[in-house]
Amino acid sequence: MREITVYNTMTRQKEVFNPVTPGEAKMYVCGVTPYNHPHIGNARPFVTWDVIRRYMKHVGYKVTYVQNFTDVDDKIINTSNGEGVSWDTIANRYIDSYFEVMDALGVQRADIYPRVSTHIDDIIAMIQTLIDKGYAYELDGDVYYSVEKFEHYGELSGRTLDDMEAGARIEVDGRKKNPMDFALWKAAKPGEPYWESPWGNGRPGWHIECSAMSQKYLGTEFDFHGGGSDLIFPHHENEIAQSEGCSGQHPAVRYWLHNGFITINSEKMSKSLNNFFLVKDILEQYSPDALRYFLLSTHYRSPLDFSDERLEEANKSLERLSTAIENLLYLEKCEPGSCDEAQRLLEKAKAYEEEFEDAMSDDFNTALATSSMFGLAKEINIYYQAVTSREGVVCQEAIAEVKRIFKFMTDVIGVLEKAWEGNTGANAAEYEELMQVILSVRQACREQKQWSLADCIRDRLAEIGITIEDSSQGARWKKREV
């Protein structure tokens, strides 16, 4: 199995991936709080982890992927009160919205999507264990985690308790043993959902939810935990304290991976700053593949600045890849035979495949991996031009292997799935026959030197997304997918 290195936020260095269970990769990614439609800052981690999961499967790992929904939260409660509907109505509405846009972006469904609201018993049990072990204490129906009890607190974020207290922006609660102690259970308040517990009616705190759900489905030690870099502190720091305090297992997570922010004019995009763009709105102007490619065009740990110009660039890049796919599908139909050029193309394809895998195996560097993909696309297009400029034959065995390699690349990145289908819809035969009639009429115009009419046919087809390519072997049409 190919060696993979990952950048571990905990150790602040790259490490060779060594799974808890050989041959398996267990990953937990913090999901959305469903109180609004997802914006592209929300989308980045899920597209990133979709690619990580795809590549881990390609390498040969059995992947278990868990992603939660934080469907009990202050923001959901505030939205429900503002609209005069129940909190679960709000949560369900925006969970549906999440799935709609992620499906459009080609994000494959996680194996498990636990919700906080259906795991209250697990959360209560974990809190009780923390109390029993001396890590937590109850105050007037609230339960707090005592950060001073956990010796590793601050290791993920690289902060000491003194640093945290000095820079804290939290309400001072004189009842707590330490200002940094955080809520595991919140006593019920009027107008909020609540559940029964040993400490009275209430609801979970934010951090305990992920600890309880990750351990339930992945065990007390698992491989990957991911999320945005804004979650390092306090959320993931607190998760570690809870999970390891409860189980005694250190570390509870072997590798912590965090993606960078999406920025607008170098400022972090977020709902709280009101400078965000909803995925559903962007998809009204750009294809899902264009947005997905944009999100993967920079290494996941680096910031990514959003602009219409970047999305236009993504569209143009995908058109180049789509052309290479169409050319490969055309070459598959050419006359079979031996050809040294095809073998040379295959040798280059294998070299690009190795480069692609090297990049993905080095902390999932999609920016570098896609450069290999474009390198191969260029070689495919050059070869296609050589074949169509003469009456040539094609080594079909070589082309089939080049196709496998190129499709592997686009499958891992998760783009242009429909392009590989070619024109295979329900009316494909009729569509092809109609296009051949149009092309024959255009060719007759060219032969009779009616250039303006021939150009008019070409231009009108272009307006509806159909491109005509002329070669010595005749005209070929293709429909733009992006």
What residue ranges belong to the model's regions?
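Alpha-helical recognition segments enriched in aromatics with Gly/Pro capping
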Residues: 1-35, 46, 50, 64, ...
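Short phosphate-binding/catalytic loops that engage adenosine nucleotides
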Residues: 61, 135, 466
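Short, glycine/charge-rich beta-strand/loop segments that flank catalytic centers
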Residues: 69-74, 95-98, 108-123, 141-150
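The substrate-binding groove and active-site-proximal loops of carbohydrate-active enzymes
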Residues: 80-87, 111-117, 228-229
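Structural preference for alpha-helix termini/caps and helix-kink/transition segments
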Residues: 268, 276-482
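N-terminal, positively charged nucleic-acid-binding surface of large information/translation enzymes
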Residues: 11-14, 20-106, 473-477
